[in-house]
């Protein structure tokens, strides 16, 4: 695409928009250490200066478009995990800073975070970007900083409410079976590795949440949409 074209044109005109009529949530641009941009920023032209001003970069030129079902905290954790693995380890800010940020993010998606973790993430991000020796380290925190800025409420939901608004983070999901939709086919029970689902054929099944390991196998197995997570 030509330099200067807007993100909106690339995503909706050239790319065809979001699949299955889902609502646009964010786009991550520039590779694993690029920032995440929201709807109000889609009219920004794709050039070096414009993207830098809004906390992103062209980088590798790749775009990752996310819809309403995407958890932005998990997105930040995913990209930080990649960056941490790729760190050469030469400089302390990148080697130790990214490791510490990843530990915090993993704690948050597991439902064990605290509000003070958000301040620590911001402090670490500032330290790493200002003191790391190479481009990878200097841009490593962009996914975290950009998602914290635009989706702070999602971080707070994981920490305060112990819920993932997008129902993505496994540790924060609870699976249930809607008795009105369940046909009693037993596919969910047969696919459950923890034997947490019981019931009689042609009658509604139920999930024992004390045994459930939250793997989501039942959600995938049900052909009637009777299994749901909250």
List each model region and its residues.
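Short metal-coordination and nucleic-acid-contact micro-motifs, chiefly zinc-binding Cys/His arrays
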Residues: 84-87, 127-130, 178, 184, ...
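Redox cofactor-anchoring modules in respiratory/redox and cofactor-processing assemblies
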Residues: 1-174
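Non-ligating segments of multi-cofactor redox enzymes
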Residues: 29, 170-171, 180, 185-190, ...
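Iron-sulfur cluster-binding cysteine motifs and their immediate structural context
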Residues: 93-99, 177, 187-206, 217-230
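Short cysteine clusters
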Residues: 4, 88-94, 134, 164, ...
